[in-house]
Swiss-Prot record:
Major place of residence: nucleus
Compositional bias segments (type: Low complexity): 431-453
One Pfam family in the UniProt entry: zf-met
SMART domains: ZnF_C2H2, ZnF_U1
Stretches annotated zinc finger (Matrin-type): 61-91, 125-155, 223-253, 275-305
The keyword Cell cycle is annotated on this UniProt entry: no
Coiled-coil region(s): none
Span list, region Disordered: 16-36, 341-402, 428-553
Annotated localization: Nucleus
GO cellular component, one term: nucleus
Single GO term (MF): DNA binding
Name of the molecule in the record: Zinc finger matrin-type protein 1
Biased composition (Basic and acidic residues): 477-513
């Protein structure tokens, strides 16, 4: 601090009127001697520094005026005693003094000019805060509501205050009385009238109350637009507004809302800001986007496709295939995947079984054993013995899914008892061809053999399905007979005891005959299955490989 106390007096002595650095006519920092400072800058004759300012600006390690770091004592002494430091200190204080003077002159000029303009023109012609002149009250209103006026208010008052022409008058009166404290008085002065801001544009009647000198007829389209909430002072301005983009956009939005109400769009969707296009299955967030989508090429194409298809879909179709084709076209036009499979796999499997029943029966010549020896057509593909179906196990229940017409069909088309045995014998004979036939078939191609075995397997499957259905229908018929017998027994119980004994003897004899018949049938079936097993064991390796690869067993 001793060094500082030694330096500061020298600095104060250097900043005196006699020193060349303190005179206004001396050279400045750039060395320009042609310009003199006293022509434009008032020079202070003496600079007096108090102790607090010295401590803030000049320290032992740093000079805030020059932004210089002082590490050593010799460096500090040479810096504070130098000419550059004295010149920068002088410029620093001159700059602060000029800024204060500029603020004072700006305040006084603004107040004087504001008072003169207010007296001469009026509140709708001039804004004293922004120094702006207006050509009409509408322009003045837009300025008072605008951003420039609000920014000026925030700069002066330090907070957001609504600015009106009445507050302009209060500001002018306060500035005339005390120009120095005008800023604080403006901040504390309340607004006398409500402002003409954007809320008065949305509410039609509020605008007349806010501006009593400029009343607007809301029913006159040349004075006010109800759709855009905008007011006009001339018919030309109204015409320009009606032909502008803003009015056209609002008009299109209103029209679109009316159309959406007519089509039955939910109010919740519109209130949430979601607009759905049912044809394209797209959700939009604004009505402008919805309007552009509805007018787009993609939507128009889809709409025309759906309309044409819906017109054609009202006709009566000749077949289900035509109706299904039109349904698929409509779904594809809407961008959806059509559902073409309406049945389950079980139904398809059952339909295949019913179709197999309708296939052609074997020729009657083969059933009775009449085979043409000249033409070897029946033995063309019988050189191999295909795999038969597994033996029927009577302990397992059979498939009871038999249509109601099966019993009547069986009674009408069932062959006699000996007919089934003749069919089995004929097929057994067909499976054992002569040596001549086997030699002819061995010379055939391998493709014919494979196709012949495949056809035989198909026939055998069909036969097995028919037999299983016949068995099921036979059981149903037996159940019906048993129920009839029970009814007869109940009727006989009401009659006399002698009649009951006689009837019971008859029924017991009939039951014994039925049991015998059932036993014979079971023995015959067991013999058939044994024969089929023996024939199945005679398969070759080629047939086994074919069955594994094609049939899966």
């Amino acid at each position: 601090m001793a060094a500082e106390s030694a330096i500061i007096p020298q600095l104060a002595e250097s900043i005196t009127p006699s020193s060349p650095a303190a005179t206004c006519s001396g050279p400045m920092a750039g060395g320009d001697t042609s310009s003199n400072a006293h022509t434009s800058i008032p020079c202070q004759q003496d600079i007096v520094l108090d102790e607090q300012t010295k401590r803030e600006l000049f320290t032992d390690t740093f000079c805030k005026v020059c932004n210089a770091v002082l590490q050593f004592e010799s460096h500090r002494i040479s810096h504070y005693e130098g000419k550059k430091h004295a010149q920068k200190v002088r410029l620093y204080f001159l700059k602060n003094e000029l800024e204060e003077m500029a603020l004072k002159t700006q305040r006084t000029d603004r107040v004087e000019f504001h008072v003169d303009g207010e007296v001469a023109q009026g509140k709708h012609k001039f804004c004293g805060l922004c120094n702006m002149v207006f050509s009409s009250p509408v322009v003045a209103q837009t300025h008072y509501v605008g951003k420039v006026h609000a920014k000026k208010m925030r700069q002066l008052a330090g907070e957001q205050v609504e600015w009106t022409p009445q507050t302009d008058q209060d500001f002018a009166a306060a500035a005339a009385t005390s120009p120095v404290d005008s800023q604080t008085e403006i901040a504390d002065s309340p607004a006398v009238e409500p402002t003409c801001d954007r809320r008065c544009e949305q509410e039609g009647s509020a605008e007349q109350q806010s501006c009593p000198d400029y009343e607007i007829d809301l029913n006159d389209p040349n004075k006010y637009c109800k759709l855009c909430c905008a007011s006009f002072n001339k018919a030309l301005v109204a015409q320009q507004h009606y032909s502008g983009k803003k009015h056209a956009r609002n008009q299109a939005r209103k029209k679109m809302m009316e159309e959406m109400e007519g089509t039955g769009v939910a109010d919740s969707e519109v209130s949430d800001g979601r607009y759905v296009c049912p044809i394209c299955n797209i959700t939009l967030t604004s009505i402008e986007m919805y309007q552009s989508h509805m007018q787009g090429n993609k939507h128009q194409i889809k709409e025309s496709m759906v309309a044409n298809l819906m017109k054609t879909s009202k006709k009566n179709y000749d077949s289900f295939q035509d109706e299904l084709a039109d349904y698929i076209k409509v779904q594809k036009a809407r961008g959806l995947v059509p559902k073409t499979q309406f049945r389950q796999e079980k139904d398809q499997y059952d339909s295949c079984d019913y179709e197999e029943e309708e296939e052609q029966e074997p020729e009657p010549g083969l059933l009775h054993g009449h085979i043409n020896s000249k033409t070897n057509a029946p033995y063309k593909y019988l050189d191999r013995h295909p795999v038969p179906y597994p033996a029927h196990n009577p302990s397992h229940p059979t498939d009871q899914r038999v249509p109601p017409w099966a019993a009547h069909w069986e009674q009408a088309s069932r062959p006699p008892k000996g007919h089934h045995l003749d069919l089995h014998k004929a097929k057994h004979i067909s499976r054992s061809p002569t040596s001549q036939d086997s030699s002819d078939n061995s010379s055939g191609s391998s493709s014919d053999e494979s196709s012949g075995s495949y056809k035989k397997d198909k026939r055998r499957k069909r036969k097995h399905h028919r037999e299983s259905r016949l068995r099921g229908s036979g059981r149903i018929r037996r159940g019906d007979e048993n129920s009839e017998k029970r009814k007869r027994k109940g009727e006989d119980a009401d009659s006399g005891k002698e009649d009951n004994k006689h009837d019971r003897g008859k029924t017991s004899g009939g039951d014994k005959d039925k049991h015998r018949r059932e036993k014979k049938k079971k023995e015959e079936q067991s013999k058939k299955h044994k024969k089929l097993k023996k024939e199945g064991e005679q398969r070759t390796e080629e047939e086994m490989l074919w069955d594994e690869s094609i049939l899966g067993f």
